[in-house]
Regions:
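Beta-strand elements within well-structured catalytic alpha/beta cores of enzymes
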Residues: 7, 50-56, 180, 211-219
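Short secondary-structure capping/turn micro-motifs that flank functional sites
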Residues: 60-61, 159
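A contiguous pocket-lining binding segment that forms or flanks enzyme active sites
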Residues: 199-204, 212-214, 218-230
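Short HxH-centered metal-ligating active-site micro-motif
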Residues: 40, 47, 54-59, 205, ...
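Flexible, D/E/H-enriched segments
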Residues: 1-49, 68-197, 208, 228-304
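Catalytic metal-binding/acid-base residues of hydrolase active sites
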Residues: 58-60, 221-222
């Protein structure tokens, strides 16, 4: 069977480091997040995939208001990205950066694709991921045949969040990738029922290939970046989603509306909905749910 598993994980850098002034409870929660990520890494290694299909919402890196598609496929030869993924290195960098800007009202924005707290450091690595171009093109054509008019691009950048999760879970970077960009930020969002059907179509296509493919959905859970609600977390919504997935009712995610996702701070959940469509109503393993000050973090995997 070519589809060898799926995982869903946050892409927030805050799951891997603590600020100098944080209390012991917060540090303990961050450590739980690290432990969950290491457990997911073991699942990725155990799956022994050839290719990772990364489903990730674009953070205004590849698209903007001139064109912000609900979905887009990368069909180029490689994907570039920058970022630091080692927790101890992140801890060192962020601690020094907080001290550097302590008491100041403004600080320099980061270059595209590099997390802001790493902008003035030379330690960040450039990553170049080899794309499984043949399979990406086959997926594109298969989706068009199934009446999903998915845009494509031959030039794609992996932003810092995408690099964080992808490289942490595959530190050897020894697997080719396929990149499906989504719009989890800019209303109107794609309808979850459409996302679920997209996942089903992807599964049909992957079932016809010989490549061993692992699906990686990044993002979430509840958070409200760049809004007055930043800091509020809809824990009840998050835990309901995880309960549905754990009970093998992932198809119920298709019943949500875009307003449900936006009001609960879960625009990025569309990546999980697509993955649920790929996996079907298979019970997933929920490793943990962690509430940090600004975000709910969910860690799950499917054995297929």
């Amino acid at each position: 069977m070519p589809l060898v598993g799926a995982v869903a994980a946050p892409h927030s850098h805050l799951q891997l480091f603590t600020r100098p002034a944080e209390n012991e409870k917060y540090k303990s929660d961050v450590q739980k997040g690290r432990n969950a990520m290491f457990a997911l890494r073991e699942q990725v290694e155990r799956a022994n995939a050839d290719t990772i299909l990364v489903i990730h919402d674009d953070h205004f890196v590849n698209f903007d208001f001139r064109c912000y598609p609900p979905f887009a496929l990368l069909v180029g030869q490689e994907a570039k990205g920058s970022g630091v993924t080692d927790p101890d290195t992140i801890e060192q960098i962020t601690g020094a950066t907080y001290r550097k800007y302590e008491g100041k009202d403004a600080y320099q924005s980061a270059p595209s694709g590099i997390p802001q707290h790493m902008a003035n450091w030379d330690e960040h690595k450039p990553y170049v991921y080899k794309v499984n171009t043949d399979l990406s093109v086959r997926l594109l054509k298969g989706l068009l045949e199934r009446e999903f008019d998915v845009p494509f691009t031959s030039d794609g950048t992996m932003d810092g969040e995408e690099v964080l999760t992808t490289n942490f879970l595959n530190p050897k970077a020894d697997k080719r990738v396929m990149l499906l960009f989504t719009n989890g930020y800019v209303p109107p969002l794609p309808w979850p029922k459409r996302c679920y059907r997209l996942g089903q179509a992807i599964r049909q296509i992957l079932d016809e290939v010989d490549d061993r493919v692992l699906v990686l959905a990044t993002g979430g859970m509840s958070h409200y970046p760049g809004t007055p609600l930043y800091g509020y977390v809809d824990e009840a919504f998050d835990k309901n989603v995880l309960a549905l997935l754990a009970s093998g009712k992932g198809s119920k995610l298709a019943d949500f509306t875009p307003d449900d996702l936006m009001h609960s701070g879960n625009g990025e959940l569309i990546n999980w909905v697509i993955t649920s469509g790929i996996c079907g109503d298979v019970k997933c393993h929920v490793l943990d749910y962690i509430r940090l000050w600004h975000i709910g973090l969910g860690y799950v995997y499917w054995e297929l």
